[in-house]
């Protein structure tokens, strides 16, 4: 089976999780603006959480209860979302009032062989850094 990791018996990410200050605003942004679909939700108040399907079965898990004093755990830098049209995806983000930190840019990843991609970055509703990633 293509893409199957024989060492752990699977492959790919199931989900990436983040804790946010404004749960409702974050869920609204990822569902209404980016088109993610709610799969399961649980908890109440600052214990709320939800899984949002990004479109291919992998999910963004959003937890309530974040604060400005909350220190990030681990070393994640950003989350990258696959798109077929980086420019159109970023237009949706701009229309929603999000801060764009890098306009769509063509780059050549210096791999062997070199890999051409188009990328853009923005800040989500809770300040998280999100990348749109388009294979060319």
Q: What is each of the regions a protein language model found here?
A:
Residues 31-33, 92-97:
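Short amphipathic alpha-helices in soluble, non-transmembrane regions
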Residues 79, 86-87, 98:
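Mid-chain, well-packed structural core segment of small domains
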Residues 37-73, 123-125, 129-134:
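Conserved short beta-strand elements that form part of the metal-binding/catalytic scaffold
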């Amino acid at each position: 089976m293509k893409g199957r990791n024989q060492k752990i018996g699977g492959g790919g990410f199931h989900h990436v999780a983040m804790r946010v200050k404004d749960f409702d605003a974050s869920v609204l942004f990822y569902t209404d603006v980016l088109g993610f679909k709610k799969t399961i939700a649980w908890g109440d108040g600052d214990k709320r959480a939800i899984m949002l399907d990004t479109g291919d079965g992998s999910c963004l898990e959003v937890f309530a209860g974040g604060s400005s004093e909350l220190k990030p755990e681990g070393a994640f830098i950003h989350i990258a979302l696959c798109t077929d049209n980086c420019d159109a995806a970023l237009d949706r983000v701009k229309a929603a009032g999000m801060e764009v930190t890098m306009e769509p840019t063509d780059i050549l990843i210096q791999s062997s062989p070199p890999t051409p991609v188009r990328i853009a970055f923005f800040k989500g509703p809770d300040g998280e850094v999100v990348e749109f990633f388009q294979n060319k």
